């Protein structure tokens, strides 16, 4: 049985969890995340609530991983990007009027 190395990553605003995992060839994304023990390190990660990808491309939990893959667990957005931009433009216009 051949062993491959993958990286499992979960980033928060102030801390990043990066875990190197040695796992059998033919394993799935779910197997690598479970082996990384990331689910026990933080309560924010869930298979049902977080999207998962490899190098910024969304994949399913049953996706077969390859040697050197970087498995990324994505956080949910706290605000809609359009709403954030709208608020940001409003604030910048308001600040310009003051000066």
Curated annotation (Swiss-Prot):
Entry-linked InterPro entries: Mopterin_synth/thiamin_S_b (IPR016155), RnfH (IPR005346), RnfH_sf (IPR037021)
Pfam families from the UniProt entry: Ub-RnfH
Membership in a protein family: Belongs to the UPF0125 (RnfH) family.
HAMAP family: UPF0125_RnfH
Protein name per UniProt: UPF0125 protein BU253
Native organism: Buchnera aphidicola subsp. Acyrthosiphon pisum (strain APS) (Acyrthosiphon pisum symbiotic bacterium)
Lineage: Bacteria, Pseudomonadati, Pseudomonadota, Gammaproteobacteria, Enterobacterales
């Amino acid at each position: 049985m051949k062993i491959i190395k993958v990286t499992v990553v979960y980033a928060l605003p102030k801390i990043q969890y990066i875990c190197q995992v040695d796992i059998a060839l033919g394993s799935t994304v779910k197997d690598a995340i479970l082996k990384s023990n990331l689910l026990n390190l933080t309560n924010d990660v869930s298979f049902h609530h977080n999207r998962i990808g490899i190098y910024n491309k969304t994949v399913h939990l049953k996706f077969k991983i390859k040697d050197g893959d970087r498995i990324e667990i994505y956080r949910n957005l706290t605000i809609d990007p359009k709403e954030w931009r709208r608020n940001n433009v409003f604030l910048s216009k308001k600040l310009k009027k003051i000066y």
